[in-house]
């Protein structure tokens, strides 16, 4: 009888510790801006290059996925979309978003975006400037076609006051879109390096 009581007590202790640990586990969000339709280097796609990476990250971490979208969609044709995006960048515009996401309940946020002329898309700035990033861990990931990170990691450190910005994943959009196995392995390796 005494042995049963000890086993029951140990079991209850382990269950309690597990429940407390689960309650204390940080909430993670993958917030991504990506553009489908006609894209440079990959043709017309159903999912934008950065969205492809975002889904891999969400799948491998169990994080929730949120897509940052401009209220007014970009044109489907590549050169028309770049004309609009370049005009937004030149004006330092902050386009309205289709919807927003309350990030207050998240401790860790993976932030994905394509590099457009060496910078974040302007809709990403709209999202960033709408929130308090104090105490958040931000993990950037981006796609590009030759410009790499373009200093956007430093831009995020300046913009997201009070947050901790970790090492970015940087990948060519053509790799994300056309070499999914390679992309998935790169994402997994990067996440392991971050402790996920």
Protein language model regions, located:
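Bacterial N-terminal signal peptides
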Residues: 9-17
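Helix-loop-strand module that forms the ligand-binding subsite of alpha/beta enzymes
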Residues: 76-162
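Bacterial N-terminal signal peptides that target proteins for export
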Residues: 1-8
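Glycine-rich phosphate/pyrophosphate-binding loop and the adjoining helix
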Residues: 164-196
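Extracytoplasmic metal-acquisition and chelation regions
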Residues: 28-29, 151-174
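Hydrophobic/aromatic beta-strand patches that form the interior of the parallel beta-sheet core
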Residues: 31, 66, 110, 139-141, ...
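Solvent-exposed loop/turn segments at secondary-structure junctions
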Residues: 35-38, 70-75, 115-119, 144-149, ...
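N-terminal beta1-alpha1-beta2 submodule of the flavodoxin-like/Rossmannoid cofactor-binding fold
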Residues: 21-108, 118, 185-196
């Amino acid at each position: 009888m005494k042995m049963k009581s000890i086993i029951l007590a140990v079991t209850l202790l382990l269950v309690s510790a597990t429940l407390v640990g689960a309650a204390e586990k940080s909430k993670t969000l993958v917030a991504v801006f990506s553009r489908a339709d006609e894209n440079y280097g990959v043709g017309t796609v159903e999912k934008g290059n950065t969205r492809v990476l975002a889904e891999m990250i969400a799948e491998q971490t169990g994080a929730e996925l949120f897509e940052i979208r401009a209220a007014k969609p970009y044109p489907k044709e590549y050169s028309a979309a770049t004309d609009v995006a370049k005009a937004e960048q030149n004006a330092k515009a902050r386009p309205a978003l289709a919807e927003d996401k309350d990030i207050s309940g998240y401790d860790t946020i993976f932030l994905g975006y394509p590099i457009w002329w060496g910078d974040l898309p302007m809709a990403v700035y709209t999202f960033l400037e709408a929130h308090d990033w104090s105490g958040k861990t931000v993990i950037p990931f981006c796609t590009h076609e030759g410009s790499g990170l373009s200093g956007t990691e430093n831009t995020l450190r300046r913009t997201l006051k009070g947050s901790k910005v970790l090492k970015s994943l940087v990948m060519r959009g053509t790799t994300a879109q056309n070499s999914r196995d390679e992309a998935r392995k790169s994402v997994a390796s990067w996440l392991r390096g971050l402790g996920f």
